[in-house]
Amino acid sequence: MAKEVVYRGSARQRMMQGIEILARAAIPTLGATGPSVMIQHRADGLPPISTRDGVTVANSIVLKDRVANLGARLLRDVAGTMSREAGDGTTTAIVLARHIAREMFKSLAVGADPIALKRGIDRAVARVSEDIGARAWRGDKESVILGVAAVATKGEPGVGRLLLEALDAVGVHGAVSIELGQRREDLLDVVDGYRWEKGYLSPYFVTDRARELAELEDVYLLMTDREVVDFIDLVPLLEAVTEAGGSLLIAADRVHEKALAGLLLNHVRGVFKAVAVTAPGFGDKRPNRLLDLAALTGGRAVLEAQGDRLDRVTLADLGRVRRAVVSADDTALLGIPGTEASRARLEGLRLEAEQYRALKPGQGSATGRLHELEEIEARIVGLSGKSAVYRVGGVTDVEMKERMVRIENAYRSVVSALEEGVLPGGGVGFLGSMPVLAELEARDADEARGIGIVRSALTEPLRIIGENSGLSGEAVVAKVMDHANPGWGYDQESGSFCDLHARGIWDAAKVLRLALEKAASVAGTFLTTEAVVLEIPDTDAFAGFSAEWAAATREDPRV
């Protein structure tokens, strides 16, 4: 395919246009009370998306000018990386990247050496990152969670309370999932054991009529992706379980009517204590779910791919749990012992999830990556043995989906804050690093210019927050920097200047550090771009047309 090549100044100028367009769209979302951005849904007939999340805005923008779109793509990448690694700071990273790229562009226009310029920027960023870590405050868990969550959710204090409950229940690195709820208010469900959304196959399994639950004690667990066709295949196993004084929970791909009738007849008569449910997972994902469950309960998954047969299963193959509670909609296993094998699988899944999050846009199918990551996260929740489900409430679907994004960001921000500490929020956290840059000596004028670019970038988030509040950004920066208190800043909620640290308005130090590092990295890519190579799209309606192929398929390739 033919190529178009765009060189040097022209390439950088058009890329800079794309950076400016995307940044101007995302910048209103910076701050606790910033306005929202309305995005047309890509599917006709569906309501628009209202968001106050920078990465959502960034991902929605694709420009017609393909060179300008490459510039916008740089900011989409930095926002996506921030969202994956820190959960918050996506708009902050966009603001920093835009400022650094803009100042680089000006410096190159007056003849600055790009290598020395980048060296100065890299040295300054490394020094600021080190200083952020040194200044970070690691306070009590409750205060940090409530403060960081309030900032990340744009001022919703109730979210912080529920996140605190969730993390108290499952731990900082425990399994917390954020899901759309069915009510106006947010709800938190903490689940002990292993749970999946498949209930009993017949109401005749119910043992508690008042609550419509089937409850089993001292449970043996049969896990299989095979279909149970004949009740006779289960009889030896049921007899062995009964002799051992236990009950049997059958989690299978499907239980045929003939086998189900035999189970129900003996269960109702009290001959055996047994309940049949559909196994967790779907399709080709089910074997992995069953292997997880087997590792957790100390049993063995009976899998078709391994050539396993139901009539050869013994008591030693079954998993063990203290109690099973089965409703019409879901199955919960309680009192799971856990094993070394389950802990090893859990660590492996966490590593795999991090690898998926680290993938950049364009690496594989975006939809495929999302589905794989969701499946891995669901398996992590199951293997954790205890999980918290945060159900997001709202009046409309649009509101719930917009809040869900912010609450997911808040959760990841809280975890980041507990890992590396916090600094005053509202853009003030960066200002404390200005003195260390003043002490940084440059080797030449262009390196000094690079250090100066980072120094001026540190004030940019605060300036934008001031402008988003209807004030003069420069005046806000000047007033904050003139104050002796390093925690002094502008509180958008109250519309006043105050000690942000004392008021509990914080940003996670990890978020600030990553935002600056990622912004400088992507701006460095822009700085060192000397040429852009593009494919020239073929607009010929008959491109790739083959008469033989058309005749064989009787299809018009232009349709």
UniProtKB/Swiss-Prot annotation:
A Gene Ontology biological process term:
protein refolding
InterPro entries attached here? Cpn60/GroEL, Cpn60/GroEL/TCP-1, GroEL-like_apical_dom_sf, GROEL-like_equatorial_sf, TCP-1-like_intermed_sf
What EC number(s) does its UniProt record assign?
5.6.1.7
Its primary localisation, in coarse terms, equals: cytoplasm
State where the protein is found: Cytoplasm
**Which PANTHER family does its entry note?**
60 KDA HEAT SHOCK PROTEIN, MITOCHONDRIAL
Q: What is this protein called?
A: Chaperonin GroEL 3
Species per Swiss-Prot/TrEMBL record? Methylococcus capsulatus (strain ATCC 33009 / NCIMB 11132 / Bath)
What gene is behind this protein?
groEL3
